[in-house]
Amino acid sequence: MRMTSNLYFYKIHSEVKDPVRATEGSACFDLHASLPQFSAVKVYENNFEEVDKRDRKVVDGRVQVNPNERILIPTGLIFDIPVGHSVRLYPRSSLALKNGLTLANNIGIIDSYWIDF
């Protein structure tokens, strides 16, 4: 178990990257995608119906994102969030500007009771 600013987290495998601050003055931690070879990701079509996970395999640490799709990208982390608290996910402006990617709901909220592998 590791700790980051009083928030404990667990890695689901050894290759998962720790949350890091990009600079000493960064207000938040950066998270990285965890896309092991031969894994799959959940893909949602434009109408938010779930598509078979087997249809979108990870190849060479990459996953294809088609127009009007939403994809859950795993971090490989499990956060030990205290009851009554949450982890907030914010999109990086550079990710949207340079790659056209952002969070579907603009801010992601992970409640203390949420665990998904």
Model-derived regions: residue spans:
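DUTPase catalytic domain/fold
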Residues: 1-117
